[in-house]
């Protein structure tokens, strides 16, 4: 038992030692932290300035405050008179006489001394003194409360003004930041616009290359001289006058082929911004190859075998001036006087006999110019990489760079535009019958030329009629040459 008791006491001592060591470790571990934290004592915070309103004594509440103080002072004085201590007097004759004399003197002294003599040690003062003192204290407390409430209202108003001022300042700062950001964005936009101003130069070069393709030129060379550029611009203007004003102003400028007629003078005026065509034409031919766009449902006239064989010879022997000058119909300027219709229109129902010779010269060039739009001729002439010249052959109306006699429109199609063209579709068995005659196919007898001033609408009508008559008679001329006595069906 003694041994077991000794073992238990030893274990208890060991546990105490372990607990003491653990406590020492616990006490020692925060010591370095406290030692480290002692030099890093935080400085006392600066006193927070509390903004408060003023206590305005020059107010009704201030008046009542002063009144309460005075009433309480009067009450205190009344209580003092009532509770003032008394002294014991011995009654003697001498003293009585003396007292009587003194009373007479006091009566002669004044009202205040007599009031004190009467109310001193009186019960009224003992009762009214504390009552008046309480009334004065009550008035004082109420006036003080009202004064502090007014001060709190002023402090609230001051805080609200501070809040409003901070909000307004933040708003103005945000507006300034937004203005600065907008200014930077506008500056970036201005830089981009200045950078984009150089793009019309490339579009002009593309327009010259397109004009070279669609203008029936036999070579791909483009001279970099100023005279060639001006010639290309005048040709594009003359072709643009054939279009309606809406198409020439909006649609053509969107494609970027040539600038609108109104802006051509501006482009001439800015002659300082000339572009070098040698270095960009080769890249523009490959970069500006637009896909073939079909603007209307009009199909290209399919050439016959004989006409296909004659295309190469006609293209080699044809000159550029004859093909362009005989077919282009220029629009006279508004500043100049109107010229007679003989020099303006190649074919019209209201012109003189001199037009017939001009029409013959233009029709003599018809087969080559009409067959230039055929797929076979286009493939032989331009190859597979250049598809821009086909833009002029896929439109039934006046296209971008098309000659006046590129497409044929029949009289039946003019009368009935909704009829299907079976001879141009996949049904190859149907062909037109030329044996029958139609009064619409006959040429009208030309009238005598009359010099007359026409309006703009009449000029546009004359141009459209001349274009329709020229294409119709061109088709008639081709059909008469290709007729081989076969039976044809006509719708």
UniProtKB/Swiss-Prot annotation:
The keyword Glycoprotein applies. Residues 1-61, 148-491 are cytoplasmic. The keyword Chaperone does not apply. The chain crosses the membrane at residues 62-82, 127-147. Signal peptide: none annotated. Residues 21-37 have a biased composition (Polar residues). Glycans are attached at residue 100. It is found in: Membrane. Residues 21-40 are annotated as: Disordered. It comes from the Eukaryota. Belongs to the TMEM200 family. This is Transmembrane protein 200A. It comes from Mus musculus (Mouse). The gene is Tmem200a.
């Amino acid at each position: 038992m003694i041994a077991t008791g000794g073992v238990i006491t030893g274990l208890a001592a060991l546990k105490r030692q372990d607990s003491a060591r653990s406590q020492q470790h616990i006490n020692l571990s925060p010591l370095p932290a406290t030692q480290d934290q002692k030099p890093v004592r935080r400085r006392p915070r600066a006193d927070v300035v509390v903004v408060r309103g003023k206590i305005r004594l020059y107010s009704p509440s201030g008046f009542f405050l002063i009144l309460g103080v005075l009433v309480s002072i009067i009450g205190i004085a009344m209580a003092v008179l009532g509770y003032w201590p008394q002294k014991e007097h011995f009654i003697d004759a001498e003293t009585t006489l003396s007292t009587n004399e003194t009373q007479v003197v006091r009566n002669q002294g004044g009202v205040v001394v007599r009031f004190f003599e009467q109310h001193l040690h009186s019960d009224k003062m003992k009762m009214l003194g504390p009552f008046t003192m309480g009334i004065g204290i009550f008035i004082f407390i109420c006036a003080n409360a009202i004064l502090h409430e007014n001060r709190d209202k002023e402090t609230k108003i001051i805080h609200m003004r501070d809040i409003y001022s901070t909000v307004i300042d933040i708003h103005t700062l945000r507006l300034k930041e937004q203005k600065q950001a907008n200014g930077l964005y506008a500056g970036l936009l201005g830089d981009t616009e200045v950078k984009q101003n150089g793009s019309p130069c490339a579009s002009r070069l593309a327009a010259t290359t397109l004009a070279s393709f669609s203008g029936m030129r036999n070579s791909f060379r483009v001279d970099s001289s100023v005279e060639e550029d001006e010639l290309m611009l005048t040709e594009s203007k003359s072709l643009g006058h054939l279009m309606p004003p809406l198409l020439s102003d909006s649609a053509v400028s969107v494609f970027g082929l040539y600038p609108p007629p109104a802006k051509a003078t501006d482009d001439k005026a800015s002659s300082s911004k000339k572009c070098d065509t040698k270095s960009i034409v080769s890249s523009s031919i490959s970069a500006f190859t637009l896909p073939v766009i079909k603007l209307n449902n009009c199909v290209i006239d399919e050439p016959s075998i004989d006409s296909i064989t004659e295309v190469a010879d006609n293209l080699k022997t044809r000159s550029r001036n004859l093909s362009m000058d005989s077919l282009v119909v220029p629009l006279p300027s508004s500043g100049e006087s109107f010229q007679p219709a003989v020099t303006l229109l190649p074919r019209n129902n209201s012109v003189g006999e001199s037009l017939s010779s001009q029409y013959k010269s233009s029709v003599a060039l018809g087969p080559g110019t009409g067959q230039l739009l055929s797929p076979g001729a286009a493939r032989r002439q331009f190859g597979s990489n250049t598809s821009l010249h086909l833009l002029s052959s896929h439109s039934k109306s006046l296209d971008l760079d098309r000659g006046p006699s590129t497409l044929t429109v029949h009289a039946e199609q003019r009368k009935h535009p909704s009829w299907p063209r079976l001879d141009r579709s996949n049904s190859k068995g149907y062909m037109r019958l030329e044996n029958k005659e139609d009064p619409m196919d006959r040429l009208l007898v030309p009238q005598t030329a009359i010099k007359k001033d026409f309006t703009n609408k009449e000029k546009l009508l004359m141009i459209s009629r001349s274009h329709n008559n020229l294409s119709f008679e061109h088709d008639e001329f081709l059909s008469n040459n290709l007729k081989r006595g076969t039976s044809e069906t006509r719708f």
